[in-house]
Amino acid sequence: MLGERGLWYKMHWFEMAARVPLLVHAPQRFAARRVKQSVSTLDLLPTLVELAGGSLEAGLPLDGHSLLAHLKGEGGHDEVIGEYTAEGTLSPLMMIRRGDFKFVYSEQDPCLLFDLRNDPRELENLAGSPAHAELFADFLAEARARWDIPAITGQVLASQRRRRFVADALTRGQLKSWDHQPFVDASQQYMRNHIDLDDLERRARYPQP
């Protein structure tokens, strides 16, 4: 977002932030096509498992669904479930995108319901529309059954307190950043006639202190 709706960055479920094209290139396996269904990156793992000839374990459920039907032009699901618990929101911000409709759910902000076919810019919130009252009620019931917002909020706040405690401790004495920073000595990283090639390759595969 670059100022649309007075918003910057993302941190919400409007199409300008949430809609990202997914490209699959496998010309020897699938004919070129464009699908209209909404899918998620959560669908990638089940797709790769099915492409590899594997099967999903009953005791290890996955949130996504295989995209093989989409790739073959045989239909496929049209649903995305989204969860946002980071900065820019007062409460966990959840989303159900199914078919033409998108429902955005929060305990602290008004719910949103959009008909993306007829309102692609998401300008008309149908949450209070009498004509969509039943659809709204169904989405709301599904969201409340799917997510325990008070429990999720409690987990988020507890995680924040733990991380703030550790961050404060790391600022005392010698500063230790949490940011991943691999320190590499370039003089020892490449072949520069200072070390036997076999030793260099061994160190590259099995780094030692």
PLM regions and their residue ranges:
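Phosphate-coordinating loops and pocket residues in cytosolic domains that bind phosphorylated ligands
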Residues: 4, 125-128
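Generic structural signal for small/hydrophobic residues in well-ordered secondary structure
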Residues: 21-22, 44, 103, 139
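Histidine-centered active-site microenvironments of extracellular/periplasmic hydrolases
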Residues: 1-33, 37-40
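A short linear boundary/processing microfeature
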Residues: 8, 73, 129-132
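Conserved short-loop catalytic and cofactor-binding motifs
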Residues: 32-36, 55, 127
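C-terminal cap/loop subdomain of S1 sulfatases and analogous C-terminal strand-loop tails that border
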Residues: 1-4, 30, 42-43, 50-116, ...
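Long, internal low-complexity/basic segments
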Residues: 128-209
